[in-house]
Amino acid sequence: MKTFHGPTCGTAVSLCLLLFLTSALEEGEITSKVKFPPSSSPSFPRLVMVGTLPDLQEITLCYWFKVNRLKGTLHMFSYATAKKDNELLTLIDEQGDFLFNVHGAPQLKVQCPNKIHIGKWHHVCHTWSSWEGEATIAVDGFHCKGNATGIAVGRTLSQGGLVVLGQDQDSVGGKFDATQSLEGELSELNLWNTVLNHEQIKYLSKCAHPSERHIYGNIIQWDKTQFKAYDGVVLSPNEICA
């Protein structure tokens, strides 16, 4: 398999080449993955989405991930606005538990039946609905203990913010912390403006061939949405579950 190294940009570079995730794909490849090397100031490997999110009152956020360590907190997805740096945040702590923060409300922390193994691909889906504040996390197709209601009831995730993968934003696009970063890989990240049902989430967690995939994010679609890469992020072809 030929590895494609995606464009990277140092922190001093003001304009970065657009990173198209589809550019890593070759005929016969299943998908593309993004590798995040270790962070150490002033280098904070990350992907930054081009554009912003719309107002959202329901979401499903799913992705495949592989971690190289379980030390500190591993921040996967960060959406920050001028008013709230934790408008939407997903992470894993040192115990391998999953945390989910919506609209700056108290974090949902859950224990999942499938433990996280270093160097192994896992699939996770986060859902939230404003109507009753129901928030859930499912790992490898199984819902976790501790899913809750009453999370950010009646709230709206606001448009105009910035999506960053692999780092935690303590201000829009900045104030990163090397102990709050992802050291590992991400693939097949999709975001919907609705709550997917259990059957759909179970389906997404399976190792399906591209011809069998029919569920793609309508807000973020892994093979369509444009990102900018910074500080040594590497893009390459990937076969999920290989």
From Swiss-Prot:
PROSITE patterns per record: PTX_1, PTX_2
Keyword entries, A-Z: Calcium, Disulfide bond, Glycoprotein, Metal-binding, Secreted, Signal
Protein name: C-reactive protein 1.1
Subcellular location: Secreted
Every Pentraxin (PTX) domain range: 30-241
Cofactor binding mode and count: Binds 2 calcium ions per subunit.
InterPro entries found in the cross-reference section: ConA-like_dom_sf, Neuronal_Pentraxin_Related, Pentaxin_CS, Pentraxin-related
Reported cofactor(s): Ca(2+)
UniProt keyword annotation of Transit peptide present: no
GO MF: metal ion binding
Glycosylation (residues): N147
Alphabetized PANTHER family for the sequence: LAMININ G DOMAIN-CONTAINING PROTEIN (PTHR19277:SF161), PENTRAXIN (PTHR19277)
Residue numbers binding phosphocholine: T60, Y63
Binding residues annotated for Ca(2+) 1, in chain numbering: D85, N86, Q169, D170
Subunit structure of this chain's protein: Homopentamer. Pentraxin (or pentaxin) have a discoid arrangement of 5 non-covalently bound subunits.
Keyword Disulfide bond: yes
Domain of life assignment: Eukaryota
Annotated positions binding Ca(2+) 2: D170, Q180
Major location (coarse): secreted
Pfam families: Pentaxin (PF00354)
The protein's role, per its UniProt record: Might serve the role of immunoglobulins.
GO cellular component terms, semicolon-separated: extracellular region
